[in-house]
Design a protein with these regions (language model features):
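Conserved phosphate- and dinucleotide-binding cores of soluble alpha/beta proteins
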Residues: 1-147
Length: 147
């Protein structure tokens, strides 16, 4: 998926997005297990405020139906049989989508839901991605500069 990413699997996606947006140049370093042919192979985290979070979850499900996602799962992330709480004291709702068709469109619709703080979609934010391969070498992917 070129330089579009899903980040925030550890639950710090709001903080990661703030840093990425403030940076002049974003470099992402990942190992080969994170490289996929299309977004959606990994769950998409969505950070939501605690208050009204069940209603926010319902709104997210409506968005996915509106955007014609047919098979999906929407669930609160759990840790020790409790809802996972981020560093910013929010909940994470994980979306299992299998394939994300239009990442920017999906982000725009999700972020418009009351209660959604941020999504783990990093669309057009990364400038360079360094992927560590199993043989110890690296693959470097750079954003094309406009000519």
């Amino acid at each position: 998926p070129m330089l579009n990413l899903i980040k925030g699997g550890g639950g710090a996606l709001l903080q990661e997005k703030i840093v990425a947006a403030a940076a002049n140049h974003m470099v992402v370093i990942a190992d080969y297990t994170k490289e996929v042919s299309s977004l959606g192979a990994f769950d998409l985290p969505v950070e939501v405020v605690k208050f009204g979070s069940p209603s926010t979850k319902t709104a997210i499900e409506k968005v996915l139906k509106k955007l014609n996602y047919s098979k999906f799962e929407v669930r609160f992330r759990a840790q020790n049989s409790q809802k996972f709480v981020t560093d910013e004291q929010h909940f994470i709702i994980d979306l299992k989508l299998n394939k994300i068709k239009e990442p920017q469109l999906l982000h725009n619709h999700l972020i418009a839901c009351p209660g959604v703080v941020e999504t783990g979609l990093f669309v057009n934010l990364a400038n360079t991605i360094v992927v560590g391969k199993s043989d110890g070498t690296c693959k470097v992917i750079r954003k094309e500069r406009p000519s």
